[in-house]
Amino acid sequence: MTDERILARLRQGTPLYGEIPASEPRLRAWVGIYPFKGTPHGPRPGNADVLPWRYRVRKFEVDRKWIEGQFDVHEEELERQEDVVMGSEAQLLERLRRWPGLALSDRPGDYPI
């Protein structure tokens, strides 16, 4: 997905997800991008249309045993977490360059959370 297509999807409020190489063989890793206006918990009533888009970017790794065992994965099972809010599209695109080859999709597949 090109940068422009990524931004177009996010501007519609669509979260995007993608798997990335993990740091160890026992782990799997993902990136999730969650667009929002206001705070990560949502806008105040009545001002959603005037607020700029911001982007919560979560990167984490999960032990394969949780995924392959088809267990529910909870926050406490996440390892090597990064959780940041990007205030602009330029910041977001710069952040995404940390993961070359990241293939984002609006279909989470086996995204565990």
Predicted feature descriptions by range:
Residues T2-D3, R64-I113:
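Mixed-charge, Lys/Arg-enriched low-complexity segments
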Residues L7, R11-G13, R28-W30, R56-E61, ...:
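Small/flexible residues
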Residues L10, S23, L27, A48-D49, ...:
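Short linear sequence motifs
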Residues Y34-H74:
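A short, structured beta-strand/loop element
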